Amino acid sequence: VFGVLPLLAAGGLAFAAVKNHRIQTGNDAFIPAAWHNLRTDEIFPDLLREPSTGGQQAPGWVRQGIVKDSDCKKALMPRLASVAVENGCTTVLRATYVDAGGEAAATVALCVLGSNDQARTIERSGLSVVADHPGPMVVPVAVPKTAAAGWRTSLGHGGGTMSPTLFGPYLAAITVGPTDPDRRYGNLPGEWKSSGQPESLVYQSLSTDLLFAFSHSFDKAVDGR
């Protein structure tokens, strides 16, 4: 009887290995098609905010509208569009968000490229959201009858890119700025007035936080299938 136990254990380990391989193989096949197979509200959830690390939860950003399957050259700012096309960009999905106070807008993009290596190549080319002044990367999408109705390219002050998954052929990109088209550049809204930072740095900081939140959300959605 005792001689059977190791065989059973080994059999169990072998079965687990085969099962895990099948799961990984299925996930590997799903990842490149995730942008097409996930629902739009799974890619761009109603609310985006950084994962809680204890303490008070950030209020987050509320989705205003979604644009599906846009041409790469039309959806991205020229600086990113050219390098994205060179790296196999086939389509771009975009969604516009507004912060909880309604004072800042952001258009987030999911770019479908040729490979994950190509996405990381773009990140390393100085367009990363954590690079030195990467600037707006996505053509803003205005959403009528919302706080983002006046959102447009000239209002974009911050932005950047990030690879949202470890293996997928995706690049996340963002443009952030004020929702008020009549507000003069340099006049900070709300509690940001006392931050002591130039406006471009404030919106760049918002870009970083929101793109990290989106990347975490998208990666979780892909892994959860």
PLM features: residue spans?
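Extracytoplasmic/secreted envelope proteins and their assembly/folding machinery
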Residues: 77, 119-123, 211, 215
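Ribonuclease/tRNase effector modules and their secretory precursors
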Residues: 5, 12, 122, 134-142, ...
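Hydrophobic single-pass membrane-targeting/anchoring helices
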Residues: 1-35
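Mid-length scaffold segments of soluble, non-membrane domains
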Residues: 90-137
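Extracellularly exposed regions in secreted/surface proteins, prominently low-complexity, repeat-rich
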Residues: 24-26, 137-225
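Short, compositionally biased low-complexity segments enriched in polar/charged residues
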Residues: 53-103
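Short extracytoplasmic
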Residues: 30-62
